[in-house]
A protein has these predicted regions:
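Residue-level "micro-hotspots" composed of small/polar
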Residues: 2, 39-49, 86-90, 122, ...
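Cyclic-dinucleotide signaling modules
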Residues: 11-14, 34-36, 61, 65, ...
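Conserved beta-propeller blade signature
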Residues: 12-15, 60-63, 101-104, 149-153, ...
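Loop/turn residues immediately N-terminal
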Residues: 18-22, 67-70, 107-111, 155-159, ...
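Residue-level detector of Asp-centered blade-edge/turn motifs that repeat once per structural unit
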Residues: 7-11, 54-58, 96-100, 144-147, ...
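Beta-propeller domains
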Residues: 98-99, 105-112, 137-148, 152-162
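Short, intrinsically disordered, charge-balanced linker/junction segments flanking boundaries
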Residues: 3, 7-8, 12, 31, ...
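Short loop/turn segments that connect beta-strands within beta-propeller blades
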Residues: 26-30, 73-77, 115-119, 163-167, ...
Length: 280
């Protein structure tokens, strides 16, 4: 199986696969139950290409697929397709923020926001001539920082955040002077507030507010490779950061990286001119 997502729900491990639907393992008994899409049977998952599985704050289980979004009904043991976002969207990531908004990231239609308190849906898409819109309709990852701001890593549009008060998106690097790459795979925040972001050009460290503290790490610094995998990251309870890539994964403690601010003095010990002998 091509496993794309894992979600632990008590004693049950939900496994989302590409082309194989969902497998749910009872970790106590080892029993496995399969959920697949069947065109002629109602209330099955909307596609066998399962890209993400997410458990909401109230216990709801959402399943993002290459053909839309559905929600698990534990009473009937089946799935309800959420028609509000349509069936032609590929849902790659789901996250519920601290303000009870469920964010749905898609690879072809921007992002959707669902207010779980009043059941209101909002659709945000990129518009070429409007800098207040999301930077790309191809969204890879969702991330909420410690202040409750939502961030979006995109495929080709770099990194942007959402201003909840102004209802607008803010591009992190509009002049292309900071980020070495516009493909953002995963985002984590360290104890000091800095972001660590994986991309197609290694991992870079940035301060989301002041935009300083920038450092880029590549394969020359010990990374498994310069290319990483979408949404493959983790911050442990100890504060360690994990990032998965195409050749394995890297783990590190961000606080152990200390910038050497000492500028050594320069001494000129020799001067050589081309095509001149020592006597000349």
């Amino acid at each position: 199986y091509d496993i794309r997502s894992l979600m632990l729900d008590g004693d049950y491990l939900w496994i989302g696969t590409y082309a194989g639907g969902i497998r749910v393992i009872n970790l106590r008994t080892g029993a496995v139950k399969a959920y697949t899409h069947s065109r002629g049977i109602p209330n099955t998952i909307c596609s066998n290409d399962v890209l993400c599985i997410y458990k909401g704050r109230k216990g709801e289980i959402y399943v993002g697929t290459s053909w839309g979004l559905c929600c698990y009904d534990p009473v009937r043991d089946n799935f309800m397709t959420i028609t509000s976002i349509g069936s032609m969207v590929s849902v790659v990531d789901i996250y519920e923020d601290m303000y009870n908004h469920l964010w749905i990231a898609t690879s072809n239609s921007g992002v959707f926001s669902y207010n779980t308190m009043n059941a209101h849906w909002k659709h945000y898409q990129h518009e070429r001539e409007d800098s207040t819109t999301i930077t790309s309709n191809s969204v890879i990852t969702l991330f909420e920082d410690t202040k409750g701001t939502m961030w979006f890593g995109t495929n080709g549009g770099g990194l942007c955040s959402f201003d909840a008060k102004e209802k607008r998106f803010i591009e992190f690097d509009p002049h292309n002077t900071l980020l070495p790459n516009k493909v953002i795979y995963a985002i984590e925040q360290d104890q000091g507030g800095d972001f660590w972001v994986s991309s197609n050009a290694g991992i870079f460290k940035i301060n989301p507010v002041t935009k300083d503290h920038f450092r880029q790490f590549t394969i020359n610094d010990g990374l498994q490779g310069n290319q990483f995998i979408a949404r493959s990251s983790l911050k442990s309870s100890e504060g360690k950061l994990y990032f998965g890539g195409i050749n394995g994964f890297n783990v590190f403690q961000p606080e152990q990286f200390v910038d050497n601010k000492y500028i050594p003095p320069v001494y000129v010990t020799d001067i050589r001119l081309p095509y001149q002998t020592d006597e000349q």
